[in-house]
């Protein structure tokens, strides 16, 4: 019999009564769904086919929310969370469900959203892109909190829906070498005279080593720098400091940039690497990112001299491999710093059939120098999606569109636009980028039919 104790969420009305409810399904955010007095009740932590004791925390006209008090009849999918911080840390929210159950739920949720909001029921369901369920994150940002009374600095993750920092000793989804650095780093930071002026700590596992980025709000003195330098040497890690202006400075050595390989099992002549500054966005799951890039290459099937447009291209995660396969690639990104790094990456990989542009992809694109007829289109937008960019489909007329999504809701909305413009959904597949969480990512292939 599992017991759960979590901080009370913000609510419009607190009710003290405890109820016994039967859970029939999960919502798209991973919360259990039950019925009570004609209302849908959302219960984080509950699973389908469970009988649970809950306490209502919020009541609206058509739904209610409840806190899970006790699992009376557990689901066959319920498992014991591996992380000792699971019930307080806000990082993971599905560790109580088997990995196979998580993936089955995510795939069903993806199909449901696409059918309900896009009317997209056609197309072949591609096998889900899956990898390791634990220690898969190659990057994580830990928060710090300095207690003025005890003079102690806590290092950990934010609690769910809170600014409170939960001190942690390990992270079961973080790469093991990075997880093993959490306790030593917490001890080190508490030895610094500037510990009250420290911000977050970012840990990165790259193909060329391990990295730590420490946010500082004022310059460190020589003694603190010496301690950081000694720690870096002892643990064989690159440490750099990020100041208030966003500038980076290496500790004890020149600043080294992390590097990732984008494709697996490639000869050195076919390898594609991506370097980045610590402030840039990169996919945190390296194993899945490689599988995702490979699947995008397979679905787009770039041919030499085809004109392929990569919108929301970042630093070249897809653009670089596309150009390596001989296509004429145009990458467009809204963050200027990432465009600069993308150009650096193109040069480092000796790719000359690749041009990057900086631009606002939610604005009028009609006069952009890259706008015009293309053969194929790749989209990898943020959670807001690519709705504005898709309004220019008629001018671009790509035969194929591969859409990589981190938000099924915006994917469904944008898919409706593609279907209205004469495209057919040919492939749809789950990308399990974040095991142990409710987050759903997906890839879809559309082909022009008229």
UniProtKB/Swiss-Prot annotation:
Stretches assigned to the TRAM domain: 12-70
EC number(s) reported in the record: 2.1.1.190
Active site as annotated: 406
One GO BP: rRNA base methylation
Protein name: 23S rRNA (uracil(1939)-C(5))-methyltransferase RlmD
Residues given in the record as S-adenosyl-L-methionine binding sites: 283, 312, 317, 333, 360, 380
Family: Belongs to the class I-like SAM-binding methyltransferase superfamily. RNA M5U methyltransferase family. RlmD subfamily.
Gene3D superfamilies: 2.40.50.1070, Nucleic acid-binding proteins, Vaccinia Virus protein VP39
InterPro entries in the cross-refs: 23S_rRNA_MeTrfase_RlmD, MeTrfase_TrmA_AS, MeTrfase_TrmA_CS, NA-bd_OB-fold, SAM-dependent_MTases_sf, TRAM_dom, U5_MeTrfase_fam
NCBIfam families from the UniProt entry: PRK13168.1, rumA
Function comment: Catalyzes the formation of 5-methyl-uridine at position 1939 (m5U1939) in 23S rRNA.
One MF annotation (Gene Ontology) recorded for this entry: 4 iron, 4 sulfur cluster binding
Swiss-Prot/TrEMBL catalytic activity: uridine(1939) in 23S rRNA + S-adenosyl-L-methionine = 5-methyluridine(1939) in 23S rRNA + S-adenosyl-L-homocysteine + H(+)
Amino acids binding [4Fe-4S] cluster: 83, 89, 92, 171
Enzyme class: transferase
Keywords, ordered alphabetically: 4Fe-4S, Iron, Iron-sulfur, Metal-binding, Methyltransferase, rRNA processing, S-adenosyl-L-methionine, Transferase
């Amino acid at each position: 019999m599992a017991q759960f104790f979590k901080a009370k969420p913000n609510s419009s009305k607190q009710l003290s009564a405890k109820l016994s409810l039967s859970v029939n399904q999960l919502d798209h955010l991973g919360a259990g769904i039950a019925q009570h007095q004609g209302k849908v009740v959302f219960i984080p932590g509950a699973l389908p086919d469970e009988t649970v004791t809950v306490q209502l925390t919020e009541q609206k006209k058509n739904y209610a929310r409840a806190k899970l008090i006790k699992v009376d009849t557990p689901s066959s999918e319920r498992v014991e969370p591996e992380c000792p911080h699971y019930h307080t840390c806000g990082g993971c929210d599905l560790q109580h469900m088997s990995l196979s159950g998580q993936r089955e739920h995510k795939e069903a949720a993806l199909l449901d959203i696409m059918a309900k909001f896009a009317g997209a029921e056609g197309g072949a369901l591609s096998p889900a892109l899956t990898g390791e369920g634990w220690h898969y994150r190659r990057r994580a940002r830990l928060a710090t909190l300095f207690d003025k009374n005890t003079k102690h600095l806590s290092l950990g993750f934010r609690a769910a829906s809170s600014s409170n920092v939960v001190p942690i000793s390990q992270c079961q989804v973080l790469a093991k070498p990075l997880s093993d650095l959490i306790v030593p780093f917490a001890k080190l930071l508490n030895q610094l005279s500037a510990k009250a002026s420290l911000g977050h700590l970012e840990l990165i596992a790259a193909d060329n080593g391990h990295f730590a980025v420490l946010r500082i709000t004022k310059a460190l003195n020589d003694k603190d720098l010496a301690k950081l330098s000694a720690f870096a040497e002892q643990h064989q890690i690159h440490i750099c400091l990020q100041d208030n202006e966003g500038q980076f400075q290496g500790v004890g050595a020149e600043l080294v940039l992390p590097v990732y390989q984008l494709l697996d099992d490639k000869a050195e002549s076919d390898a594609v690497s991506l370097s980045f500054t610590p402030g840039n966005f990169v996919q945190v799951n390296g194993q899945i990112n490689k599988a995702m890039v490979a699947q995008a290459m397979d679905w787009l099937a770039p041919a030499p001299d085809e004109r392929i447009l990569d919108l929301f291209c970042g630093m070249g995660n897809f653009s670089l491999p596309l150009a390596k396969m001989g296509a004429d690639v145009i990458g467009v990104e809204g963050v200027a710093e990432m465009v600069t790094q993308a150009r650096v990456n193109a040069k480092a990989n000796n790719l000359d059939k690749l041009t990057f542009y900086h631009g606002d992809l939610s604005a009028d694109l009609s006069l952009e120098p890259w706008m015009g007829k293309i053969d194929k289109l790749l989209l990898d937008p943020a959670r807001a999606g690519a709705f504005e960019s898709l309004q220019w489909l008629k001018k671009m007329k790509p035969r194929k569109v591969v859409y990589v999504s981190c938000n099924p809701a915006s994917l469904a909305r944008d898919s409706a636009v593609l279907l209205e413009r004469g495209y057919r959904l040919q492939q749809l597949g789950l990308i399990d980028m974040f095991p142990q969480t409710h987050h759903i990512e997906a890839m879809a292939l559309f082909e022009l039919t008229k």
